[in-house]
Swiss-Prot record:
It is a multi-pass membrane protein. Signal peptide: none annotated. The chain crosses the membrane at residues 34-54, 78-99, 114-134, 179-199, 227-247, 289-309, 321-341, 348-368. SUPFAM superfamilies: a domain/subunit of cytochrome bc1 complex (Ubiquinol-cytochrome c reductase), Transmembrane di-heme cytochromes. The cytochrome bc1 complex contains 11 subunits: 3 respiratory subunits (MT-CYB, CYC1 and UQCRFS1), 2 core proteins (UQCRC1 and UQCRC2) and 6 low-molecular weight proteins (UQCRH/QCR6, UQCRB/QCR7, UQCRQ/QCR8, UQCR10/QCR9, UQCR11/QCR10 and a cleavage product of UQCRFS1). This cytochrome bc1 complex then forms a dimer. This is Cytochrome b. Component of the ubiquinol-cytochrome c reductase complex (complex III or cytochrome b-c1 complex) that is part of the mitochondrial respiratory chain. The b-c1 complex mediates electron transfer from ubiquinol to cytochrome c. Contributes to the generation of a proton gradient across the mitochondrial membrane that is then used for ATP synthesis. The keyword Cell wall biogenesis/degradation does not apply. Its cofactor is heme b. A ubiquinone binds at H202.
Length: 380
């Protein structure tokens, strides 16, 4: 009898075990689609990014013009650029929903998978930041100046570190060229980390909405979840293409249509929408080092969630108190996002400070307390 190549070939066997014959829980919902959607986002960004890099020039005198040239003179250059810019937004929408799913259903108890996931988020944020600088518009330049300057808050070595990162005494040509190099490199680091993420995931298998072991009821990934994932792909790509074709600049900053000018500061410097919640936390502390620490903590706090899990139940499905807190946290992050887009004046300052305080309080204090109380109420 002939050998089944899919199951015996050294490379195909790995693909088969990850995407075809993978045993998956029979009851995972659409919230489990976002992992594969992130994979599609990553592939889309690498393909469109590669095509853009073929026409881009990483030089302060030419960068802005080269992006304009792409949109005007390159076949479908405008579409490739719009897909790449809006693809980043979809990447972040998917990753935030993916993390929210993990928090809600207790997926963070797969510690290795979760920790690699947080590192992936940090790498994605770094990639998006250096990428936003490349068109060399006003917001690109001033965003780079403001964010890189934060490193100067590090005691003793801060200023040296910033000048080393800039390659000079301000954001200039060396900064742009190294940011382009990093923006080209980091997506491939993300690919590598994704493979590690999947390797750890397949050690334990997927979690499920009930938060209980599902070894007694597994189904093959293909055809069940391949079909389910394809539906997600179609919906997400339809939304992405619609955004890129109808309102490509909806999520961008109009300030970036002006070439970078070190002599003119924009009235309101703010990052892209997906960083606004962290930016609001940074701004809400009236001290440079304190703000930088809070900014870092806003993401790094995710590393602590497995350690703060006090509930005897894994998922929040049967924990109404924790559910209320979870949705309060979601609303809180949305408020932070809104505050981050507003000028630094009353009442936004105090709203931002309250929202920042409640963000950390919910994650570090209220979640563990609510879980302990639920254990008591359920007599667990």
């Amino acid at each position: 009898m002939a050998l089944n190549l899919r199951k015996n070939h050294q490379i195909l066997k790995i693909i088969n075990d990850a995407l075809i014959d993978l045993p998956a829980p029979s009851n995972i919902s659409t919230w489990w689609n976002f992992g594969s959607l992130l994979g599609i986002c990553l592939i889309t960004q690498i393909v469109t990014g590669l095509l853009l890099a073929m026409h881009y020039t990483a030089d302060t005198n030419l960068a802005f013009s080269s992006v304009a040239h792409m949109c005007r003179d390159v076949q479908f250059g405008w579409l490739i650029r719009n897909l790449h810019a809006n693809g980043a937004s979809f990447f972040f929408i998917c990753i935030y929903l993916h993390i929210g799913r993990g928090l809600y259903y207790g997926s963070y108890l797969n510690k290795e998978t979760w920790n690699i996931g947080v590192i992936l988020l940090l790498t994605l944020m770094a990639t998006a930041f250096v990428g936003y600088v490349l068109p060399w518009g006003q917001m690109s330049f001033w965003g780079a100046t403001v964010i890189t300057n934060l490193f100067s808050a590090i005691p003793y070595i801060g200023q040296t570190l910033v000048e080393w990162a800039w390659g000079g005494f301000s954001v200039d040509n060396p900064t742009l060229t190294r940011f382009f190099a990093l923006h080209f490199l980091l997506p491939f680091v993300i690919v590598g980390l994704t493979l590690v993420h999947l390797t750890f995931l397949h050690e334990t298998g997927s979690n499920n909405p009930l938060g209980i072991p599902s070894d007694c009821d597994k189904i093959p990934f293909h055809p069940y979840y391949t079909i389910k994932d394809i539906l997600g792909f179609v919906l997400m790509l339809s939304l992405l293409v619609s955004l890129a074709l109808f309102t490509p600049n909806l999520l961008g900053d109009p300030e970036n249509f002006t070439p970078a000018n070190p002599l003119v500061t924009p009235p309101h410097i703010k990052p892209e929408w997906y960083f606004l919640f962290a930016y609001a936390i940074l701004r809400s502390i009236p001290n440079k080092l304190g703000g930088v620490l809070a900014l870092a903590a806003s993401i790094l706090v995710l590393f602590l969630t497995p350690l703060l899990h006090t509930s005897k139940l894994r998922s929040m499905t049967f924990r109404p108190l924790s559910q209320i807190l979870f949705w309060t946290l979601v609303a809180n992050v949305l408020i932070l996002t809104w505050v981050g887009s507003q000028p630094v004046e009353h009442p936004f300052i105090i709203i931002g400070q309250l929202a920042s305080f409640s963000y950390f309080t919910i994650i570090l204090v209220l979640f563990p307390l609510a879980a302990a109380l639920e254990n008591k109420l359920l007599k667990l």
